[in-house]
Amino acid sequence: MTAGIAPMKRELKELQLLFEISQILDRTLDLREAVGPVIDAMAAHMGTVRGTLALINRQTGEISIDAAHGLSESQKERGRYRVGEGVTGKVIQTGRPMVVPRVSEDPLFLNRTGARDGLKKKDVAFICVPIKIGTEVMGALSADHVLPKEVSLEEDVRLLTIIGSMIAQAVRLRQSAQEERQKLMDENRRLQDQLKEKFRPANIIGKIGRAHV
């Protein structure tokens, strides 16, 4: 009898988490508003000590952390990768989940954010799943667990994959908005450079000299 209670409790917690996430996404598909509460809900229901959402910029190929639970702003800023680099980069490259049972034992785990420096890395497990629509991978959702834990890491992979599929549409909208913003910034920078070159003193003097010839 007792043996059957634990799985039922776990399933109930999962349903509560997925229902809470669906409510968040019903309120908004703006990832800036949705992803923070989603990752916070993961921490509350799954017991994760950290969670991150990383997005890939399809123009530059850079992967950066867009939202996180348990990371400071400076740690988020340090979380930048290329496709295929580290666990997050590998997940985005392959489109397949990865589990690192102990981050201290896997050289692929880079700890680029520095968020695990204060912990015994042998006691931290890292789970990362792709966020995709069809075959297009847009980013990755990851979570840290402090060991030992009651629920198997495989169960967490399954649950994170479900959550990733739930937020995929919001991620696509956010990714497109970020890329459009980057395109506008690049165009603005290009125009500024052109204006600086056009109005350099040497260029202006040259034009005046030619006008008097």
Where are these regions (language model features)?
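Signal-transmission linkers at sensory-effector interfaces
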Residues: 1-33, 44, 66, 186, ...
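Amphipathic alpha-helical "output/dimerization" segments
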Residues: 17, 133, 151-169
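AAA+ ATPase active-site-proximal loops
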Residues: 35, 192-212
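Signal-transducing coupling segments at domain and membrane junctions
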Residues: 73-74, 101-125
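A short, aliphatic-rich beta-strand micro-motif
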Residues: 124-133
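GAF sensory/regulatory domain recognition
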Residues: 40-43, 52-79, 105
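Acidic/proline- and glycine-rich, intrinsically disordered low-complexity segments
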Residues: 73-98
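Regulatory loop-to-helix N-cap segments in sensory/regulatory domains
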Residues: 2-10, 144-161
